[in-house]
Amino acid sequence: MRAELAVYFIAGTQDIVRGTLPSVLEEALKGGITCFQYREKGAGSLQTASERKEMALECQKLCAKYQVPFIINDDVALALEIGADGIHVGQTDEAIRQVIASCSGKMKIGLSVHSVSEAKEAERLGAVDYIGVGPIFPTISKADAEPVSGTAILEEIRRAGITIPIVGIGGINETNSAEVLTAGADGVSVISAITQSDDCHSVIKQLKNPGSPS
């Protein structure tokens, strides 16, 4: 799971500024992302279940073509219906124990955490495959984001002896990803770093190898 978290792209229709979600996703897949989470939320997102399912299936097909895990944010029923590779939920989405009961053994389970105690609980549960920790830096992509934690939260989690795979989240781009990895994350998740880039292949290369020339 750790390798799959290296460059974890998150996006929904609401995040796309040029082109379409499938076209942006395919460019990112060609560029080398290692995981994709379909997150359809907020202003500008698809509003009907049928639209979201149709888009999810299109994105899932692209991920399968490039052999990259396809994860759905929050919507357990949709993830189960279409056979997603994973489900990611937050602390205020469906209760994690309910998600585990429905999904464990069928797909990977990711959980957002914002403190050492939440990280400890995620590891204690045993069925959570990875945690998303953040927001590390200020973010424009999530209107309901928690307060910024900085990279210190990653160091605190690792110092506490927590070994569960971690992907850093929130305001991460090619200029600050090295800090996130050095602090203890196994990978970085990005939205605008890819969706707003004129050259996502270069961005992804730098996210995978911080300090490398673009």
Swiss-Prot record:
GO terms for biological process: thiamine biosynthetic process; thiamine diphosphate biosynthetic process. Keywords: Magnesium, Metal-binding, Thiamine biosynthesis, Transferase. Binds 1 Mg(2+) ion per subunit. SUPFAM superfamilies: Thiamin phosphate synthase. Mg(2+) binds at D74, D93. GO terms for cellular component: cytoplasm. It comes from the Bacteria. It is an enzyme of class 2 (transferase). PANTHER family: THIAMINE-PHOSPHATE PYROPHOSPHORYLASE (PTHR20857), THIAMINE-PHOSPHATE SYNTHASE (PTHR20857:SF15). This is Thiamine-phosphate synthase. It comes from Listeria monocytogenes serovar 1/2a (strain ATCC BAA-679 / EGD-e).
